[in-house]
């Protein structure tokens, strides 16, 4: 209802976030091209970073040392090249990707699986502030919505939708990362994967997008 929408807007603004509808001229153009484009995005920071070339770096929360180094190298390389890094601010690969991009002077965008006024995981509150100061944190969910397991697969279409391509850094066979890669393929985005240890369980999801072409 209109009353609920006004309350949501008020809550977001109190938190310091803005609201961008898909008919807004500044709404990310690439996102408009995808099926099930979000009607609104709550934005903390500056979403103009989405106008640059964007690449999503995604992967497991339970990363290996190899995965960490790969995410760090990619995040730094993309950030230093003026390419915006998009990820989900989860533990592991996402966190390293965001941090390393910012450390290289780059812009980054985090797509949350909860409302903009919440932070998941909670220990990434400081990272959230850093991302908002060097890009944007976005969410399509109501501002106070708590994280739910069903929200993460839904938001993954936005991670791939904002991006020209998705790079799977390290992932298990059945994972949210695989969902993001599948969305990317459906959206006509390029999908890349970091070569990994074929014997590691956290690499099985890395090879899946390669097999799917």
Named regions from a protein language model:
Residues 1-7:
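Helix-hairpin-helix
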């Amino acid at each position: 209802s209109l009353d609920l929408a006004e309350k949501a807007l008020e809550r977001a603004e109190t938190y310091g976030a803005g609201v961008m509808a898909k008919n807004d001229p500044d709404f990310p153009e690439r996102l408009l091209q995808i099926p099930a484009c979000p009607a609104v995005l709550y934005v903390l920071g500056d979403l103009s970073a989405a106008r640059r070339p964007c690449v999503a770096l995604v992967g497991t929360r339970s990363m290996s040392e190899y995965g960490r180094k790969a995410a760090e190298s990619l995040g730094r390389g993309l950030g230093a090249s003026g390419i915006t890094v998009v990820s989900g601010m989860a533990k592991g690969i996402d966190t390293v990707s965001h941090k390393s991009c910012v450390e290289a002077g780059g812009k980054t965008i985090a797509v949350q699986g909860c409302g903009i006024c919440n932070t998941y995981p909670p220990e990434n509150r400081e990272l959230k502030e850093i991302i908002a100061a060097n890009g944007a944190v976005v969410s399509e969910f109501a501002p106070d919505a708590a994280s739910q397991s069903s929200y993460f697969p839904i938001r993954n279409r936005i991670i791939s939708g904002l991006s020209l391509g998705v790079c799977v850094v390290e992932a298990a066979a059945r994972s949210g990362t695989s969902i993001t890669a599948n969305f990317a393929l459906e959206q006509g985005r390029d999908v890349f994967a970091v070569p990994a240890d074929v014997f590691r369980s956290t690499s099985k999801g890395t090879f899946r997008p390669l097999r799917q072409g």
